[in-house]
Amino acid sequence: MKTFSAKPAEVKRDWYLVDASGKTLGRLASEVARRLRGKHKPEYTPHVDTGDYIVIINADKVRVSGKKAQDKMYYHHTGYIGHMKSMNFNQLMERAPERAIEFAVKGMLPKNPLGRAMFKKLKVYAGTEHKHTAQQPQALEL
């Protein structure tokens, strides 16, 4: 029996809706990254993007354990010498709550062109409203 290898044109992708309210950031992100990669499917193939689309709502209600709200830092560089900017989890949630989930999930995906294609299938919204009702996403309890 030959080993099955999925072909990009034959991959069936579903849309899922995840409610992040009250969920722990890392546990949510690891399951979302797993589904974006397609590792939950029997036809998973490492070199083909077999993952599903994930829509996350209520990103502003995600939580972290312990003192991470004050201690977890996010860094970025502006491009100017000495302009390393930093903010903690609470400041990031005030400024852009969806970015915290995006950073967590992106860090769990492969760092190559395939990983960037997988990340494009993630849609994160701070509130309960999203613009993907036409795709009829199925509710997914994580």
Curated annotation (Swiss-Prot):
One of its GO terms (molecular function) is structural constituent of ribosome. Pfam families: Ribosomal_L13. GO terms for cellular component: cytosolic large ribosomal subunit. GO terms for biological process: negative regulation of translation; translation. It comes from the Bacteria. The keyword Plastid does not apply. PROSITE patterns: RIBOSOMAL_L13. Disulfide bonds: none annotated. InterPro entries: Ribosomal_uL13, Ribosomal_uL13_bac-type, Ribosomal_uL13_CS, Ribosomal_uL13_sf. Keywords: Ribonucleoprotein, Ribosomal protein. NCBIfam families: rplM_bact. Part of the 50S ribosomal subunit. HAMAP family: Ribosomal_uL13. This protein is one of the early assembly proteins of the 50S ribosomal subunit, although it is not seen to bind rRNA by itself. It is important during the early stages of 50S assembly. Belongs to the universal ribosomal protein uL13 family. This is Large ribosomal subunit protein uL13. It comes from Thioalkalivibrio sulfidiphilus (strain HL-EbGR7). The gene is rplM.
